[in-house]
Regions:
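Glycine/Thr-rich phosphate-binding loops that ligate phosphate moieties of nucleotide
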Residues: 1-149
């Protein structure tokens, strides 16, 4: 039940603050990418993701890396920096106010975020390749982490 912080790097890699922070954000999205791989195997496809929560407070950064991890465009609205309680409140409002046959996606698109300003980032081939390389190393490093537990 105790966490073990683990930072691994290759001897030939450059240890810099930028690379360290990128690794932190990539790691935050690595488990999501693994889950999305399972969904792909089940023939579930994503068209776009909406980024919401504290990780998106700084515009563009986590959004760009999430787009690379998911392989789909990511839109962040003006309210993207609001976190979990905001999302829970939206789910509660949906349960209370939804119309017959109205999906959560429809409710959010037409009644909550209609007219909200946002930015969409499409994953670049270079970012996708960079994340794929990270994810391959991440999967390998999971064995080392398991050995420590």
């Amino acid at each position: 039940d105790a966490g073990i912080p683990l930072l691994l790097r290759r001897p030939d890699s450059e240890f810099s603050l930028a690379n360290f922070m990128r690794a932190q954000i990539y790691a935050a999205f690595a488990t999501l990418a693994l889950g999305l791989d399972i969904l792909k195997q089940e023939n579930v496809a994503l068209d776009i993701l909406l980024g919401h929560g504290g990780i998106f407070k700084t515009p563009g950064v986590a959004q760009r890396y999430l787009a690379a991890a998911a392989g789909v465009p990511v839109t962040c609205l003006e309210t993207a920096g609001e976190g979990g309680p905001y999302g829970m409140a939206l789910l509660a409002a949906y349960r209370l106010h939804r119309r017959d046959g109205e999906t959560l996606a429809d409710y959010l698109q037409t009644r909550v975020f209609a007219g909200a300003a946002g930015e969409t980032v499409t994953p670049s081939p270079a970012d996708k390749a960079g994340f794929a390389a990270f994810l391959a190393q991440y999967k390998t490093a999971l064995q080392a982490e398991r050995a420590l537990m």
